[in-house]
């Protein structure tokens, strides 16, 4: 099953997450099908903290991909931020 979830990057104490479409059997930071966006929890005021390619997210959901709970929360947060 294809899932859309976070893959951790960055360095120690400086997390950075890629939002990826991957097979659920792959490791968290392992092989992925496509990078859909990113999330930087430590972004400062001048930096972009969240970017999601909505067209690709819609495509993957259309072919049956499931969102992880955290990615679902981030998508909701991004939609709220875009509307404001």
Swiss-Prot record:
The keyword Ribosomal protein applies. InterPro entries: Ribosomal_bS16, Ribosomal_bS16_dom_sf. Keywords: Ribonucleoprotein, Ribosomal protein. GO terms for cellular component: cytoplasm; small ribosomal subunit. One of its GO terms (biological process) is translation. The keyword DNA damage does not apply. Gene3D superfamilies: 3.30.1320.10. One of its GO terms (molecular function) is structural constituent of ribosome. Belongs to the bacterial ribosomal protein bS16 family. This is Small ribosomal subunit protein bS16. The gene is rpsP.
């Amino acid at each position: 099953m294809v899932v859309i979830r976070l893959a951790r990057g960055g360095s120690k104490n400086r997390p950075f997450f890629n939002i990826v479409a991957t097979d659920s059997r792959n490791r968290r930071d392992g092989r992925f099908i496509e990078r859909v966006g990113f999330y930087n929890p430590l972004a400062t005021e001048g930096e972009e903290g969240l970017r999601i390619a909505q067209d690709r997210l819609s495509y993957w959901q259309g072919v049956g991909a499931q969102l992880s709970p955290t990615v679902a929360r981030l998508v909701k947060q991004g939609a709220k931020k875009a509307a404001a």
